[in-house]
Amino acid sequence: LKTFDEDLIDIDKNLELLNNFFLQVKNLIVDNNVIKKDYSNKKILFEGAQGALLDLDHGSYPFVTSSNTISSNISIGSGLQVDYETIGIFKAYATRVGNGPFPSELFDKIGDYIADKGVEFGTVTKRKRRCGWLDLVSLKYSCEINNVKELCITKVDVLNELDEIKICKSYQGKQFQDINFSDSAYLNNCKLNGSDFELFPSWGNIDGIMSYDGLPQNLKN
């Protein structure tokens, strides 16, 4: 630290700080072997964070996080062999925080509207998220690498007041199997040279609707 003209760290002060943190989470920490023994016939909730395309190995490298975010990391991270069915959760539009390829990104007032209406700001940094149209290509890829069997769509109401909705259905007409999702340069090129979109009419207000049957036909489409 002296080499970089930085102040020396107060070791005792930092140890005391870390110990205070430890005391707060102490009762939440357990050895995995205890879980195997005591919870073998019970349901366990595993919590992860960040989207599939930020996965260290399968995301749009190098614009990824420092760990695996796909569902199979449950077994890797916990050491437990888990038999599970994956439900994929996605928004009715696409978002991204920070740099990285985003073929369906919006740079106009619609993108700003989605960010404001959907409260798309970083949880910690409060940084505004980049917003774009729903990208079926990346969604399909995310389903494949997570072995998704069912899908749950969220934030549909954010798009209620728009006149038209676009959905990205392909990248420059390429077949899905020909796309390399780890090649950020290629994905950026798709954004610069145009992705392929399909236009849909909006569905209007869906406030108070409590069943699938009650949803507007445009939304079902």
Q: Residue locations for each model-derived region?
A:
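Non-transmembrane, aqueous-exposed alpha-helical and coiled segments at domain scale
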Residues: 1-221
